[in-house]
A protein has these predicted regions:
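The feature represents the first ordered module of a protein
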Residues: 1-80
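Eukaryotic low-complexity, mixed-charge intrinsically disordered interaction/regulatory segments enriched
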Residues: 71-76, 83-86, 94-98
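General N-terminal targeting signals
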Residues: 35, 43-45, 70, 83, ...
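Conserved phosphate/pyrophosphate-binding and hydrolysis machinery centered on Walker-type P-loop NTPases
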Residues: 56-59, 78-85, 102-109
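C-terminal charged interaction modules
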Residues: 87-132
Length: 132
């Protein structure tokens, strides 16, 4: 499983693995429960390689954020998203100290940590963006 095959679908919880293309969109499999569904072509779908986080300098790809989280947690999951915004911001501030505190909202941090935990729970250990 590579990061380029992992999708975030607007309005749907969790992350999805790309399975195949269908007439009306994509067939995807949930990383949460393993169920397959059809994601219509009109849905807002993003691969995780297309997403980046705001920092004080250059924006950094989500893959780099996940790599830093993985190194910091030593291969374990990060804090639970139920621990509250203060704990998640503290964790994120240690992992990405120069993130833009004005443009990165609490919900963005919560989603990034949630996705990281989901990927680690699914056995993903390398968060690299493949060369084109």
């Amino acid at each position: 499983m590579e990061l380029k095959d992992i999708l975030a679908i607007s309005g749907q919880p969790g992350l999805y693995r790309f399975i195949a293309q269908s007439r009306n969109g994509f067939i995807v499999e949930s990383l949460l429960d393993g169920k397959r569904m059809n994601a219509s072509a009109s849905s807002r779908i993003s691969t995780l390689t297309e997403i980046s986080m705001f920092t004080e300098g250059e924006d950094i790809p989500l893959a780099e954020v996940f790599t830093k989280m993985y190194a910091y947690t030593e291969g374990k999951q990060g804090p639970s998203t139920k621990e509250g915004n203060a704990r998640l911001k503290e964790f994120f501030g240690v992992v990405i100290p120069d993130y833009d505190r004005e443009r990165v909202h609490d919900s963005d941090i919560k989603k990034a940590v949630s996705w990281f935990n989901l990927l680690v729970g699914a056995g993903m250990t390398k968060f690299e963006i493949p060369e084109e």
